[in-house]
Structure formats: C-alpha cells, structure tokens
Amino acid sequence: MKRTYQPSRRKRKRTHGFLARKRTPGGRRVLKNRRRKGRWRLTV
C-alpha cells in the first residue's frame, strides 16, 4: 500500500509557502495569527 506522504519540495512550497499564504484572505489570517502567537517560523 502506498504511503500518503510523498515529499516534494515544489508542492510543499506552493501549497504551504509564504507567497501562497499571502495570496488568499484565509492565508493572510493564518500569517496574522502565527505572528500574534509569536511563532519562529510563519510558514514551512
């Protein structure tokens, strides 16, 4: 049976990267919340 996690740098950046987050209102909310919480890393 194939594993569900098949790592790919490009896919990871495109779906969870900073620019991807900036692009949508929901993503911007994620960034805002992570900034407020004081996360070291905002995105992947």
From Swiss-Prot:
A Pfam family that the UniProt record links to this protein: Ribosomal_L34
Cellular component GO terms held in the UniProt record: ribonucleoprotein complex; ribosome
PANTHER family linked to this entry: LARGE RIBOSOMAL SUBUNIT PROTEIN BL34M, MITOCHONDRIAL RIBOSOMAL PROTEIN 34 FAMILY MEMBER
Family that this chain belongs to: Belongs to the bacterial ribosomal protein bL34 family.
Membrane in keyword set: no
GO biological process, one term: translation
Membrane-traversing stretches: none
Alphabetized InterPro entries for the sequence: Ribosomal_bL34, Ribosomal_bL34_CS
Lineage: Bacteria, Thermotogati, Thermotogota, Thermotogae, Thermotogales
Molecular function terms from GO: structural constituent of ribosome
Region named Disordered: 1-44
Full protein name: Large ribosomal subunit protein bL34
HAMAP family in alphabetical order: Ribosomal_bL34 (MF_00391)
Keywords: Ribonucleoprotein, Ribosomal protein
